[in-house]
From Swiss-Prot:
Family from the record: Belongs to the GST superfamily. Sigma family.
Annotated source species: Mus musculus
Annotated ranges, domain GST C-terminal: 81-199
CDD domains to which the protein is assigned, alphabetical: GST_C_Sigma, GST_N_Sigma_like
The protein's name in its UniProt record: Hematopoietic prostaglandin D synthase
Catalysed reactions listed for this entry: prostaglandin H2 = prostaglandin D2; RX + glutathione = an S-substituted glutathione + a halide anion + H(+); 2-glyceryl-prostaglandin H2 = 2-glyceryl-prostaglandin D2
UniProt subunit comment: Homodimer.
A GO CC term attached to the entry: cytosol
Tissues of expression: Expressed in skin and oviduct.
Cofactor note: Glutathione is required for the prostaglandin D synthase activity.
């Protein structure tokens, strides 16, 4: 088993999908969390100057979803068939497209608040309706077993509920899916022991 070192801020953010996968697959890794104050001196040392990165076998891999796909490859978490893997990837990419619209780094607080409000009030309901329809009466997004798409839904929706607590009130099936993910023993244990951060 390779030695893994995950580098990210002390928050859930874009690294949490990687942490969920490590937890579920029972893979040991170093969860190295950096403080915002240290970021300016660390940034120039990284390929592409972004985190999270995963250090493995002398390589530094960037891009959270690429790392997640690497870790889930050849496991059922990715999907059991090529078609199911494509479906899981599509759900993840749909969620990621939306989460990437938020201006997390915007310095103008008034503008940031307006943009967040627009996304949460007008665009989020459309996304949730589509996800609810896609889930339908299935137990998980891709049928009868959990994939990393379900993990990513739980992670993204947790952040959305921090930003707008009542957002899922009319989507009981999506709430139920969150609950099922959080009830998986390995995920439940991780949620209990992880550092408590807002995002």
């Amino acid at each position: 088993m390779p030695n893994y070192k995950l580098l990210y801020f002390n928050m859930r953010g874009r690294a949490e999908i990687i942490r969920y996968i490590f937890a579920y697959l029972d893979i040991k890794y170093e969860d190295h969390r950096i403080e915002q104050a240290d970021w300016p001196k660390i940034k120039p040392t990284l390929p592409f100057g972004k985190i999270p990165v995963l250090e493995v076998e002398g390589l530094t891999i960037h891009q959270s979803l690429a790392i997640a796909r690497y870790l889930t490859k050849n496991t059922d978490l990715a999907g059991k068939t090529a078609l199911e893997q494509c479906q899981a990837d599509a759900v993840v990419d749909t969620l990621d497209d939306f989460m990437s619209l938020f201006p997390w780094a915007e310095k103008d607080q008034d503008l940031k608040e307006r943009m967040f409000n627009e996304l949460l009030t007008h665009q989020a309901p459309r996304l949730l309706k589509d996800l609810d329809t896609y889930l339908g009466d299935k137990e998980w997004f891709i049928g009868n077993y959990v994939t990393w798409a379900d993990f990513y839904w739980d992670i993204c929706s947790t952040t959305l509920l921090v930003l707008k607590p009542g957002l899922l009130d009319i989507y009981p099936k999506l709430v139920s899916l969150r609950n099922k993910v959080q009830a998986i023993p390995a995920i439940s244990a991780w949620i209990l022991k992880r550092p408590q951060t807002k995002l």
